[in-house]
From Swiss-Prot:
It catalyses: 2 acetyl-CoA = acetoacetyl-CoA + CoA. One of its GO terms (cellular component) is cytoplasm. It is found in: Cytoplasm. This is Acetyl-CoA acetyltransferase. It comes from the Bacteria. PANTHER family: ACETYL-COA ACETYLTRANSFERASE, CYTOSOLIC, ACETYL-COA C-ACYLTRANSFERASE. GO terms for molecular function: acetyl-CoA C-acetyltransferase activity. NCBIfam families: AcCoA-C-Actrans. Homotetramer. It comes from Rhizobium meliloti (strain 1021). Its EC number is 2.3.1.9. One of its GO terms (biological process) is poly-hydroxybutyrate biosynthetic process.
Amino acid sequence: MSNPSIVIASAARTAVGSFNGAFGNTLAHELGAAAIKAVLERAGVEAGEVDEVILGQVLPAGEGQNPARQAAMKAGLPQEKTAWGMNQLCGSGLRAVALGMQQIATGDAKVIVAGGMESMSMAPHCAHLRGGVKMGDYKMIDTMIKDGLTDAFYGYHMGITAENVARKWQLTREEQDEFALASQNKAEAAQKAGRFADEIVPFVVKTRKGDVNVDQDEYIRHGATLDSIAKLRPAFDKEGTVTAGNASGLNDGAAAALLMTEAEAARRGIQPLARIVSWATAGVDPQIMGTGPIPASRKALEKAGWSVADIELVEANEAFAAQACAVNKDLGWDPSIVNVNGGAIAIGHPIGASGARVLNTLLFEMKRRGVSKGLATLCIGGGMGVAMCVERL
């Protein structure tokens, strides 16, 4: 018996906020709730019809029990429905969609909301004090750096893995800066043209000066120039090539997708954004974690029965320009179809949400262009990648 066709009935995301920016005091589950509500409203599905919510999140410390459940309840799902969070680092938001697809394919659910959420701004500092401190100072650990951005095997920052990739793939500082500039310029043009408007659900932030409606990505740098990027010093290795300008940011945001079978969508009169054709995850050396999309994309393409030449649009997360350039070179796809509206270097990288964010951006741009076959992929800390092939019906 063949598996049923699983479709993405609707998708939505919040804007991406800068570190300590518009969402600086907003908890991740509040952003997640907004994305959940939006996908239900866009598809005309009642909250009580959702079987389960699955949300990726990398930095849940201090947010209370099961932030995914908090997001689901805040979005109006009845208490009888369930929700849970998962963590595959930067791939979490896309892996959550794959998990939702699997639950529907096995008959364990009919309707799933899946995606990711993250507040890097609200990630707390912590200290291990249960054994007591007899005297003297005690070091606080930044959970954002420790749990989100430091390699667990070699003990260094993700930026060093990008330096490793740059050396192994012989990528110059100039190549990386030019890639970063292109990302910024494409994102600026897309934002000015309103091309992100269909993706983004406005989110109201309450401030002492009144309510602020956040409906634009905050991190995109308008007017970026090669000269301004080239002036930045290396951020992780003083002799290196990776800078704050050719790396993604620290960001806040959420994104979600509503999943069901193609038959269920037809029964409800819903025109899906796309069907999920295949997905895959793969491991690589943690020292070059940014190359994870290379084997993951190849596996997903093989499972789909596609070749690289079949792909009409790609969203490949830009953790760093170095790894993004290496992925493009090794996979050999047409760079003109990759991140056509800019990527994470410009838009930002709220780590647990980014997988669902790139999927959202891919789906809406495929619809806008009228193309059929697309691929979303991300590198993952610890030496992994995840990829998904989708097809418009």
